[in-house]
From Swiss-Prot:
A cellular-component GO term for this protein: mitochondrion
Name of this chain's protein: Kynurenine--oxoglutarate transaminase 3
MF GO annotations: cysteine-S-conjugate beta-lyase activity; kynurenine-glyoxylate transaminase activity; kynurenine-oxoglutarate transaminase activity; pyridoxal phosphate binding
Cofactor(s) for this UniProt protein: pyridoxal 5'-phosphate
EC numbers for this chain: 2.6.1.7, 4.4.1.13, 2.6.1.63
CDD domains per UniProt: AAT_like
Recorded catalytic activity of this chain's protein: L-kynurenine + 2-oxoglutarate = kynurenate + L-glutamate + H2O; L-kynurenine + glyoxylate = kynurenate + glycine + H2O; 3-hydroxy-L-kynurenine + glyoxylate = xanthurenate + glycine + H2O; an S-substituted L-cysteine + H2O = a thiol + pyruvate + NH4(+)
Native species: Danio rerio
Keyword Acyltransferase: no
Length: 450
């Protein structure tokens, strides 16, 4: 072979080998990048979210949205005016104390000092956070760790399980069970814990139990005796209690809200969560707080100072002023804490009546602004929608499409083992204007007409 031809062949082979090496290296780089771009294990399997799924579906303005728990009634004018006034003060548009703006924590110590019947240190026993979510997250990150177990009562607010898992702990679930066999007149009080079952969930690994009262989504207010039973187990097993009480002021006639932290032996082991959004109907402000003993709160403060650091100053100033205004009116008709509950009680009763007229079975809540309803009696055939989702998910999607009415499936608030118990229930929100409830009533009245 001519030397020139041989050189050409050798050159071609070299180019081919070089190209293959580059491709192989590029492939290795891609695989390495894929591994490094993978999610952290602590969020594995936590990407599904009922709010993301149903908020977009219900975004059509023609749909009457009773799904998400936000008010479409106006907040108190003095709270909005307080924000406008705060924004006009230059220093209140800058950073404030990271653990809570002085005006707000002092106001909280006054209001809750009266509620707890104890003096609260505004700077050591209260932490202001970004909503109730921030309070719960700070609590989990500060006090729960890998290998711990946290007891969660079903149905639960959906962020509890992901937050426990992100802390490296194991959620241990126990359901409320319906004790009444009646098909009408069911109350949230008819949903109870089996005390033997509850006791069986506590062991040496149990770090905490989460109590939500009034409960979202059922609206159950845990009675003093029910809370005492939980407290006894906490004390026996040296367990913490995380008490989510964001609906604490929305208590309807004939019922009493008891703070588990006020029971003997519970203050030193309880973190109580509160919310400005729920207190003053300003959910978009995203302000919440944790109240508890100094030896626990300081750990939450550590999380706060190394994550979010602080909350918006003018919002905190406005909420603080609002709390002080209503503190002076506590026990009087003009106090917003109690006035809102009176307003919502009528809306609750109206919603229960119109759901019952349609053939559904409402569970009338003792507190909060949600109502779950059993849709079993409607006998809606949804077999055409497949069997890859629980019945309530399919029912809500069908109802949004066919009836233009949005709700939330209750199995979004339970674990896999309790799906069958809750899949015929949907959750509706009634902190809505009369015009919104009018539109919902029109849909329900015409339910069987097409």
């Amino acid at each position: 072979m001519h030397p020139i031809h041989l050189l050409r062949i050798v050159s071609s082979v070299r180019r081919l080998l070089q190209t293959n090496r580059c491709r192989s290296f590029s492939s290795c780089q891609h695989n390495m990048a894929s591994i490094k771009h993978k999610n952290a294990r602590r969020i594995e399997g936590l990407d599904k979210n009922v709010w993301v799924a149903f908020t977009s579906v219900a975004a059509d303005p023609s749909i009457v949205n009773l799904g998400q728990g936000y008010p479409d009634i106006p907040p108190p004018s003095y709270v909005k005016e307080g924000l406008a006034q705060a924004a006009m003060v230059d220093r209140l548009n800058q950073y404030t104390r990271g653990f809570g703006h002085p005006t707000l924590v002092k106001a909280l110590s006054k209001v809750y000092g009266k509620v707890y019947d104890r003096q609260l240190d505004p700077f050591k026993e209260i932490l202001v956070t970004v909503g109730g979510y921030g309070s719960l997250f700070s609590t989990m990150q500060a006090l729960v760790e890998e290998g711990d177990e946290v007891i969660i009562i079903e149905p639960f607010f959906d962020c509890y399980v992901p937050m426990v898992k992100m802390a490296g702990a194991k959620p241990v679930l126990i359901p409320l069970r319906l004790k009444s066999t009646a098909t009408t007149g069911i109350s949230s009080a008819d949903w109870v814990l089996d005390q033997e079952e509850l006791a069986s969930k506590f062991n040496s690994k149990t770090k905490a139990i989460i109590v939500n009262t009034p409960n979202n989504p059922i609206g159950k207010i845990f009675s003093r005796s029910e809370l005492q039973a939980i407290a006894d187990l906490c004390i026996k097993h040296d367990t913490l209690c995380f008490s989510d009480e964001v609906y604490e002021w929305l208590i309807y006639k004939g019922h009493e809200h008891v703070k588990i932290a006020t029971l003997p032996g519970m203050w030193d082991r309880t973190i109580t969560v509160g919310s400005a959004g729920k207190t003053f109907s300003v959910t978009g402000w995203k302000l919440g707080w944790s109240i508890g003993p100094e030896h626990l709160i300081r750990h939450l403060q550590t999380v706060m100072q190394n994550s979010l650091y602080t909350c918006p100053t003018p919002l905190q100033e406005a909420v603080g002023r609002g709390l002080l205004r209503d503190f002076e009116l506590m026990g009087q008709p003009d106090c917003y804490f109690s006035a809102l509950a009176l307003e919502l009680e009528g809306k609750r009763d109206r919603m229960a009546a119109m759901l019952a007229q349609t053939g559904m079975t409402p569970v009338v809540p003792e507190g909060g602004y949600f109502m779950i309803v059993d849709v079993t009696a409607l006998n809606q055939d949804l077999t055409h929608m497949g069997d890859d989702e629980p019945y309530d998910y399919k029912f809500v999607k069908w109802m949004i499409k066919e009836k233009k009415l949005a709700a939330i499936p209750v199995t979004a608030f339970v674990g896999e083992d309790s799906v069958k118990q809750f899949e015929k229930y949907i959750r509706l929100c009634f902190i809505k204007q009369e015009s919104t409830l009018d539109a919902a009533e029109a849909i329900l009245k015409n339910w069987n007409k097409g």
